[in-house]
């Protein structure tokens, strides 16, 4: 199963983003397809934080618009929204021991641990920091 990182969601929403068209097509294709795909809950909240932040975008996305974007995604029958499960503490420990992720990278470790716990093996992201987490194949859909 493929999972999406926050940046794909942000690029799909923000038309001025360099990768907007590609991200929008990717997201629309996954949402309308039958193959299971996933987003970890921390990415949902990070999307809201980024697109509605005045310090990031001028003007920022209106909160109601951002929420409606998410509600439309949530209607996709093939989407799996992933959170911490029963094995999360042990998976978190393994991910942190292996990656030595700390500081700002702890957030990425949280996402990686959720995905690994749920058996996700491929993450689509433009964030190269995820390459440090063994057990996740990282694909940048914007690189040729």
What is the role of each PLM region?
Residues 1, 112-144:
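Acidic, PIN/NYN-like endoribonuclease modules and their adjacent C-terminal/linker elements
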Residues 1-39, 54-68:
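Short, well-structured N-terminal submotif of metal-dependent ribonuclease cores
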Residues 33-34, 76-77, 133:
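Structured helix-beta-strand junction loops
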Residues 36, 78-80, 137:
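Conserved beta-strand segments of alpha/beta enzyme cores
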């Amino acid at each position: 199963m493929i999972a999406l990182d926050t940046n794909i969601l942000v690029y799909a929403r923000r038309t001025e983003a360099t990768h907007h068209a590609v991200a929008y097509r990717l997201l629309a294709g996954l949402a309308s397809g039958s193959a299971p795909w996933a987003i970890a809950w921390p990415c949902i909240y990070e999307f809201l934080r980024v697109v509605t932040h005045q310090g990031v975008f001028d003007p920022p996305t209106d909160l109601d618009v951002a929420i409606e974007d998410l509600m439309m995604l949530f209607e996709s029958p093939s989407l799996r929204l992933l959170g911490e499960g029963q094995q999360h503490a042990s998976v978190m420990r393994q991910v942190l021991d292996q990656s030595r992720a700390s500081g700002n990278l702890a957030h990425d470790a949280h996402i990686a641990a959720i995905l690994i716990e749920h058996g996700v093996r491929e993450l689509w992201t433009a964030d190269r920091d995820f390459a440090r987490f063994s057990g996740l194949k990282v694909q940048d859909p914007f690189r040729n």
